[in-house]
Amino acid sequence: MKVEIYTKDHCIWCDRAKGLLNAHSIDFEEFDLSNDEERFQFYEKLGDNVKTVPQVFINDQRVGGYQDLRAWLNE
């Protein structure tokens, strides 16, 4: 399973989402949107419609934010 999470510095929901993934022993790749290059890739992937973080993708499908991830893990 390929998991990507887009985050920003000082984001409590980002920290919680990463904690949730870790609690389920799910490896993930983190992209920090505080970094200009990673932010550009994010907007290239999603457009500028999504403005909140975290954003989680599983196998290249957008799951959404923290609450969406929680719901996905409980399915």
PLM feature segments, named:
Residues 12, 37, 64:
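Short alpha-helical
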Residues 1-29:
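Local sequence-structure signature of Cys/Sec-based thiol-disulfide redox active-site neighborhoods
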Residues 24-27, 45, 71-72:
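Non-catalytic interaction surface on structured domains
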Residues 58-75:
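Non-catalytic, surface beta->alpha helical segment in thiol-disulfide oxidoreductase systems
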Residues 47-56, 66-67:
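Structural micro-motif
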Residues 33-50, 75:
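Thioredoxin-like thiol-disulfide oxidoreductase module
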Residues 15, 19, 40, 71:
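Alpha-helical elements of the RecA-like P-loop NTPase motor core of helicases
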